[in-house]
């Protein structure tokens, strides 16, 4: 009967050591657990090392004496003890990120949206970072630093000088032509009258001579 109890204890010790080793490797933060296994047997407590050899170790009760009773009723109860860990205070990263985001937005913010919102009266504001001053892109028909000046279209009346000159030239040409024609007619008439007078004089002379 003692041999069976020893064998069962050895097998349970091996299983517990394997489980403790695996749990220690897979636990959070990779820390090893306490390497001690407590065996509860019939009201007594026995301490067994997790690295004990598989065969040859006999678990003894604190009160001493050999194990007795049924093997099924004397199966050990296994409990694991772990080292207490200190409280971990989480780092506050939210405020830092918000501050950084706020600073980044402040650098990229366009002053024309707030400070120089009403700088351009009739145009679009454009902030020039190299000069550190705003500039205005004026709408058609406006000018000035703030697009406050209005350009009024000036209509030039059609010039009548060219028409007058042309009419004067045409009048002079027509007048000259008329004068030339009139002069030619007068000369032709005078010439014809002179020829007629000469013929009459000759006829008169011839008539006088015939009468004599």
UniProtKB/Swiss-Prot annotation:
GO molecular function: epidermal growth factor receptor binding; growth factor activity; heparin binding; transmembrane receptor protein tyrosine kinase activator activity
Comp. bias regions, Basic residues: 90-106
Extracellular topology ranges: 19-167
Disulphide-bridged cysteine pairs: 112-125, 120-136, 138-147
Keywords for the protein's UniProt record, in alphabetical order: Cell membrane, Disulfide bond, EGF-like domain, Growth factor, Heparin-binding, Membrane, Receptor, Secreted, Signal, Transmembrane, Transmembrane helix
Alphabetized Pfam families for the sequence: EGF (PF00008)
Domain EGF-like intervals: 108-148
Membrane-crossing residue ranges in chain numbering: 168-188
Signal sequence annotation: 1-18
GO biological process terms held by the UniProt record: cell chemotaxis; cranial nerve development; epidermal growth factor receptor signaling pathway; ERBB2-EGFR signaling pathway; ERBB2-ERBB4 signaling pathway; positive regulation of cell population proliferation; positive regulation of keratinocyte migration; positive regulation of phosphatidylinositol 3-kinase/protein kinase B signal transduction
Induction comment: Strongly induced in embryonic fibroblasts transformed by v-Jun.
Stretches for region Disordered: 82-108
Subunit structure as annotated in this protein's UniProt entry: Interacts with CNIH2.
Record's protein name: Proheparin-binding EGF-like growth factor
Species, as recorded: Gallus gallus (Chicken)
Gene: HBEGF
């Amino acid at each position: 009967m003692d041999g069976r109890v020893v064998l069962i204890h050895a097998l349970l010790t091996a299983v517990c050591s394997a489980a403790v080793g695996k749990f220690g490797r897979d636990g959070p933060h990779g820390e090893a657990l306490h390497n001690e296994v407590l065996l509860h047997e019939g009201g007594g407590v026995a301490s067994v090392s997790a690295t004990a050899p598989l065969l040859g170790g006999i678990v003894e009760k604190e009160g001493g004496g050999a194990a007795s009773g049924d093997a099924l009723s004397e199966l050990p109860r296994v409990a694991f003890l772990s080292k207490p860990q200190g409280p971990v205070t989480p780092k506050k990263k939210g405020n830092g990120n918000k501050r950084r985001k706020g600073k980044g937005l402040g650098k990229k913010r366009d002053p024309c949206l707030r400070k120089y919102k009403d700088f351009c009266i009739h145009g679009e504001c454009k902030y020039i970072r190299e000069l550190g001053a705003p500039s205005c892109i004026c709408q058609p028909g406006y000018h000035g630093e703030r697009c406050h000046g209005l350009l009024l279209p000036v209509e030039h009346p059609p010039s009548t000088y060219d028409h007058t000159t042309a009419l004067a030239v045409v009048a002079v040409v027509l007048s000259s032509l008329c004068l030339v024609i009139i002069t030619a007619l007068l000369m032709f008439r005078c010439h014809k009258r002179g020829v007629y007078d000469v013929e009459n004089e000759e006829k008169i002379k011839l008539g006088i001579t015939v009468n004599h």
